[in-house]
């Protein structure tokens, strides 16, 4: 329930007036669009565009030489005829002009929620900003615009109005009278249009058109994916939740029998107390706090740490995974936010996709029991089956490819192996180094993904001296892996950046 608005003692002055006509924009080649919304669950559930638990309250449009904000559902009044505005807006969307947004996924999803589809190309200046600098501290329109066009967003009137009305200027903007929002909202579209003009020069300067076009062409498919979502078996999820709670309760009782008290499985001090009672040694951090890593608990020969680890795994499966599925379920489907590029909402600096609300990539895979159990809650479409596809040793192939281009020692044997058939890189490295395949694979992938020495030792399950000896032997007999890593590091240090085959830049300033 919304709290009542406090009546302002002084109304902030504004010169903004709503548009007096609905212009014909079909002759314009570029149209910038920005929506203002009421999206009450945005911070906890993600965009409400699919759930439709919010609404569009106003539409800002800008073209060369003209701009306007069309309020249609401000609680504080001052709205235009909703049906008239939406009919006009649909005509705008159907023009062949390129539609320009900042954070297009948000606005385009709300446009889809309104029942409209966009004709013509879609440009996202946030994607452009991320490709130009994936390490920015902020990707807001205000931040990016200040850097590239030297103009930010003026929020003075909006902040003053929100203060007078006693509301949050961003989250509750929809509650204000439209005239107090119009200036702020309209400038979003104007700045987005100007920003795109500047970003084109930056894309050209950094030679990023190929990767920008790739991301741009991919975008409509991602919107479709978001709205399609993935089916989930809610009944099974609820039953699984109950079953896991029973198992977790039993494990807590088993732990109590050994320790003599109720152990808080996520509290280091509580676990330390239990270890002290049964006289088990444990590590401490540099600051002296008890340390109980997953690997330490899982591989410990005593029953107590094993039970604590198992209870943790079940608790995490129940709270992190199943509760998340139940929370984000919408009519039997999960509609995650897809983070195409790095942004303030998530994403990666490498261009790899990530998901949020919920994060589908966190679904466990390696646990022999919990992995299949949680994954079985996601069900394919009717008359379809899930397919599992993966590249065959993609990381090793890339390493060998680039190492062979540099003619690094030891690569020719691997190249010959790949050329002669379906070679097993990990086994070839194991044979070269005289170690087990499992150990070779752990070291291979650890080095390829920049795993630190301590983490690598933990993954190998060896004590420090034995692990260091094994890694040393690996580097002596398969030297090209470290040699390539060192060469790439030097190049990154010298130029401050590297470029992928697809043209994406990774900066190391």
What is each PLM-predicted segment?
Residues 117-134, 141-146, 421-427:
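Conserved beta-strand -> loop -> alpha-helix junction used to position metal-binding or nucleic-acid-contacting
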Residues 64-99, 230:
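Nucleic-acid-processing active sites and adjacent nucleic-acid-binding tracks
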Residues 421-435, 501-509:
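Generic long, charged, amphipathic alpha-helical segments
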Residues 131-134, 183, 389, 417-420:
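Conserved, non-catalytic sequence blocks in retroelement Pol enzymes and Pol-derived host proteins
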Residues 437-449:
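Short, amphipathic alpha-helical "recognition" segments used to contact nucleic acids or chromatin
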Residues 32, 97-104, 388:
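Acidic beta-strand-to-loop metal/phosphate-binding motif
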Residues 112-122, 136-142, 405-414:
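A short alpha->loop->secondary-structure connector
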Residues 1-74, 119, 136, 146-370, ...:
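Conserved "right-hand" nucleotidyltransferase catalytic core of DNA-directed polymerases
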